[in-house]
């Protein structure tokens, strides 16, 4: 069974959009996929239904999305829209790294189908004084789906994220480009450039919500 960590080349790139699309695609084919969003900054309880975790809950078929429901997949929620280590400190709290990893592992072990763990921000965002999202991924030992944008600068940002992940021996299952307006070049050109620069054995690079991406998801669900 395949489980994936959803991270990105930066913040506000579309991790939740891509993760929710993966969940909806699998569930439409009767694959019992689930997702976690364990850490969130910029979270407002009154807007729980439109939060990242709320969007994932709706993709999983939840009819009632409120703060209590969000807490089941997002235990560490902070109001300030800043780096999670800073958001936690500003709230007088911290993100206990071992507890974070244990929470995810318990959910993965109990999963009946594919489990997605959506990170926070980009791959190198700090979680506390010593840990980043990359450390979180490495501790879980699951493959990454790296979300990239179509904006100016995305090629450099994506290649840097790939290098950072590879430096820790983290397997990248796929790179998914989430087309973001305005697009400085056609998204297919971005895909071609990434493939040229990702090394001799590059991970597959897809454009979100395309037949090729959906076919890859179908194959991943059968592993």
Curated annotation (Swiss-Prot):
Give the binding site residues for ATP.
12-17, 52, 118-121
Main subcellular localization, coarse class? cytoplasm
Task: Report the Pfam families cross-referenced here.
Answer: AAA_26
Q: Name the enzyme group at the top EC level.
A: ligase
Q: Which reaction does it catalyse?
A: (7R,8S)-7,8-diammoniononanoate + CO2 + ATP = (4R,5S)-dethiobiotin + ADP + phosphate + 3 H(+)
Q: Where is the active site?
A: 37
Q: What is its EC number?
A: 6.3.3.3
The protein's matches in Gene3D superfamilies, at most eight in alphabetical order, are given as:
P-loop containing nucleotide triphosphate hydrolases (3.40.50.300)
Q: Mention one GO biological process in which this protein takes part, according to its record.
A: biotin biosynthetic process
Q: Which domain of life is it from?
A: Bacteria
Give the UniProt subcellular location, in the record's own words: Cytoplasm
> Is tRNA processing a UniProt keyword of this protein?
no
Pathway listed for it is:
Cofactor biosynthesis; biotin biosynthesis; biotin from 7,8-diaminononanoate: step 1/2
Binding positions for Mg(2+) per the UniProt entry = 16, 52, 118
Q: Which residues bind substrate?
A: 41
Q: Which cofactors does this gene product need?
A: Mg(2+)
CDD domains recorded: DTBS
- Which molecular function GO terms apply here? ATP binding; dethiobiotin synthase activity; magnesium ion binding
**What cellular component GO annotations does this protein have?**
cytosol
Keyword line: ATP-binding, Biotin biosynthesis, Cytoplasm, Ligase, Magnesium, Metal-binding, Nucleotide-binding
Protein family (similarity comment):
Belongs to the dethiobiotin synthetase family.
Q: How does it assemble?
A: Homodimer.
Query: What is its biological role?
Result: Catalyzes a mechanistically unusual reaction, the ATP-dependent insertion of CO2 between the N7 and N8 nitrogen atoms of 7,8-diaminopelargonic acid (DAPA, also called 7,8-diammoniononanoate) to form a ureido ring.
HAMAP family xref list:
BioD
Q: What is this protein called?
A: ATP-dependent dethiobiotin synthetase BioD
**Could you tell me which species this protein originates from?**
Acidiphilium cryptum (strain JF-5)
